[in-house]
Amino acid sequence: MRGAVWAARRRAGQQWPRSPGPGPGPPPPPPLLLLLLLLLGGASAQYSSDLCSWKGSGLTREARSKEVEQVYLRCSAGSVEWMYPTGALIVNLRPNTFSPAQNLTVCIKPFRDSSGANIYLEKTGELRLLVRDIRGEPGQVQCFSLEQGGLFVEATPQQDISRRTTGFQYELMSGQRGLDLHVLSAPCRPCSDTEVLLAICTSDFVVRGFIEDVTHVPEQQVSVIYLRVNRLHRQKSRVFQPAPEDSGHWLGHVTTLLQCGVRPGHGEFLFTGHVHFGEAQLGCAPRFSDFQRMYRKAEEMGINPCEINME
């Protein structure tokens, strides 16, 4: 029997996830049992009609007869909404243009009222918990390289699933757009000179200005930083708007993690970052005098990845 399972696994080209390493977190489903169900017809492929978003229910006859559903989405942005979750979903994300997996970054943001399932990053049978099923918690953006794996969504045991819906938005972006995602491994550390110089080239916004105020929002685990900008090098989605007094300045706000402990600071900064799910998120933000030093040094060495007007 064991040999037959492994032979079937090789033919299917897919292994079922194994348990994560030591640490807190709910256990994944029994791997051998669900592997057998998957290989013996317990999984189905669900293709979204618009290839960007998927909405399904665990109460349909087809879903109840299967432990695992495969969902295929081919788009740069969209959403997944799973009502009355039972069993598990494997969500396969791909862009609508050809691009190698190692050059793609995926960001997901759970719906605020999402509940009923845990969301894992899965690759070659290993699971890493991304989003725990905690009802009412604010959805934190999670980003990872597509090369690191795909999404495995596992329903958690519930006595009453009638009020449960698991859902999230997703975005796929090129690896260069994701260069500010060094914050995943060390979310509050300062950027290196190299990371700052690359952020200048790839960020959705690059502005020079001052911190006017900082508001901490514990229930969302974020800090909101209000900026007065005196030089707008680049922006998308109109994050910064002209000041009402027509003073040649722009006003706007960006967010960062509450755990970073951002406070109002004196002096001029260069702010960079990306817009995810309509929200401007802070990336690298060196003091402008420090940026001038590193930029001129790179310019002298001829290693600037791109140019910016320093005046």
From Swiss-Prot:
Highly expressed in subcutaneous adipose tissue. It is found in: Secreted. Induction: Up-regulated during adipogenesis and obesity. Induced either in muscle after exercise or in adipose tissue upon cold exposure (at protein level). Expression is induced by Ppargc1a isoform 4. GO terms for biological process: brown fat cell differentiation; energy homeostasis; fat cell differentiation; negative regulation of inflammatory response; positive regulation of brown fat cell differentiation; response to cold; response to muscle activity. GO terms for cellular component: extracellular space. Glycans are attached at residue 103. Residues 1-45 form the signal peptide. GO terms for molecular function: hormone activity. Hormone induced following exercise or cold exposure that promotes energy expenditure. Induced either in the skeletal muscle after exercise or in adipose tissue following cold exposure and is present in the circulation. Able to stimulate energy expenditure associated with the browning of the white fat depots and improves glucose tolerance. Does not promote an increase in a thermogenic gene program via direct action on adipocytes, but acts by stimulating several immune cell subtypes to enter the adipose tissue and activate their prothermogenic actions. Belongs to the meteorin family. This is Meteorin-like protein. The lineage of its organism: Eukaryota, Metazoa, Chordata, Craniata, Vertebrata.
